[in-house]
Each structure stands twice: as structure tokens, then as C-alpha cells.
Amino acid sequence: MVKGEKGPKGKKITLKVARNCIKITFDGKKRLDLSKMGITTFPKCILRLSDMDELDLSRNLIRKIPDSISKFQNLRWLDLHSNYIDKLPESIGQMTSLLYLNVSNNRLTSNGLPVELKQLKNIRAVNLGLNHLDSVPTTLGALKELHEVGLHDNLLNNIPVSISKLPKLKKLNIKRNPFPKPGESEIFIDSIRRLENLYVVEEKDLCAACLRKCQNARDNLNRIKNMATTTPRKTIFPNLISPNSMAKDSWEDWRIRLTSS
């Protein structure tokens, strides 16, 4: 794309437009939501709104994030997923208030991830899935507050041991990578402490396909349980339900509800 050229349906973002896109989150934080607006270049005018707590530029046509993004010193939540970004700026390491970073579904390579990422000492969730990473950045091993890491759908053939030693890691997604040994990903995951928090959704909130998937999984669990014992047992996990597309912030965790009857 020629420098300065706009996308086919690009929208000019003015300061007035940006201000109209500010929302207040349920916990009183200020979010600037510029997602799905056909933006082709990072709008410089939003730097005048650098007091935002959250910034959503996802599902646009952005190719480059400028160093000036570090002016968002209060930012705790940055969503850049589904763009055309192939490199993150070194200045991202200065955004030490960040708790959540989503850069999935871009064109990032391992060389496009700066070592300055290791300065994000407070970050808890990073999603690097659906990119072109052929190795895991060693900087991730320095982020001791990480609870969730997404590395799915990349070009990885191994995972460094430092990732499994992250003290607070609860969820790691490394599915659909070309690991050379069958089952390597499962063995790696087994070395990590299991997820402690499970979330509940009601059956009425599930789409038909998700509900069928859950019911099939529940039936399979019951069959395995029945094969392991000769004594008739009460059905286990009567309300096992699977990932819900509506709960996007859960990173596709399984939800399980245990009820007594």
C-alpha cells in the first residue's frame, strides 16, 4: 500500500469523531472504541485523548502502530486484533499500566515482537494467536504476572520451558501449531497448573451448535464413567456446557456448572 493511501472504505477519524466513540465501562473506565471503522492508518488525533484507560482499534486495516502510542500511559487494555500489523513498536514497553494486550489475527513474525515487551511487568493477558510466529519470544518468560497466553494458530515447533514456569499462568492456548512430536502440546500443558476459575453460562445463552457440542461431551464423559465402574452412578456433570461465543472476554474457556439435585 502506497504511503498515505486510504483503504477502499476507510473512514477519516477526526478528534470529534473519536470523542463520540468514547464509552464508559461497567467499572467506570474510559474506553475509546474505534473498532470496525475501516481505518487504514493510526489516527494521530487520538493522541489528544491519551487519558483513556482502554483503546480498541480491532478489525480495521491498520498496518503500522507508531511509537507515539506510548503516550497512552494510563492504558490498561489495548485491542489491536484483526489488522495487518507486522511489527510492534519498541515504545510499547513504556506502557507499563497495560494489563491486557490482544494482537491476534495480524501478520506478526517473531522478529516483529520487540524485546521491550519484557518491561510490561503488570500485564496479565497476551493474545498472539493467528500470526506468523515461528518461535515464542523469550520476553514472555519475564512477565511474571501473566495469567493467560494465546499462541494458537502460528508456526511454532516448540515452547520454551520458561513459559511453563510462569508462576501465575492459568490458561495457555497453543493449539494448531506444527509441533514435530504428536502430543507434545498436551504434555507441555500437563506441566502447567490447571485453570482454577470456571465460569457459568445458562443453556439459553448458547447457540444450538454449542449446546449440541456440550451435550455430546457430557454424554461421552458419562459413558467413560460408566465403563470405569460396575456400580450404577448418578450422571456426572449434568449441565456441562461448552464455549459460548457471547462471552468473548473469556478466551474460549470451558464453562462448567455443577448443580445438586
From Swiss-Prot:
GO BP annotation list: intracellular signal transduction
Pfam families linked: LRR_14
Keyword Cytoplasm attributed: yes
LRR repeat ranges per the UniProt record: 28-49, 51-72, 74-95, 97-118, 122-144, 145-167, 168-189
Compartments, as annotated in UniProt: Cytoplasm
GO CC, alphabetical: cytoplasm
Coarse class of the protein's main subcellular location: cytoplasm
SMART domains in the cross-refs: LRR_TYP
Annotated InterPro entries: Leu-rich_rpt (IPR001611), Leu-rich_rpt_typical-subtyp (IPR003591), LRR_dom_sf (IPR032675), LRR_domain-containing (IPR050216), LRR_R13L4/SHOC2-like (IPR055414)
UniProt cross-references to SUPFAM superfamilies, sorted A to Z: L domain-like
Keywords: Cytoplasm, Leucine-rich repeat, Repeat
Role summary: May be involved in the regulation of spermatogenesis and sperm maturation.
PANTHER family named in the record: LEUCINE-RICH REPEAT-CONTAINING PROTEIN 18-LIKE, PTHR48051
Protein name: Leucine-rich repeat-containing protein 18
Source organism of this protein record: Homo sapiens
Species lineage: Eukaryota, Metazoa, Chordata, Craniata, Vertebrata
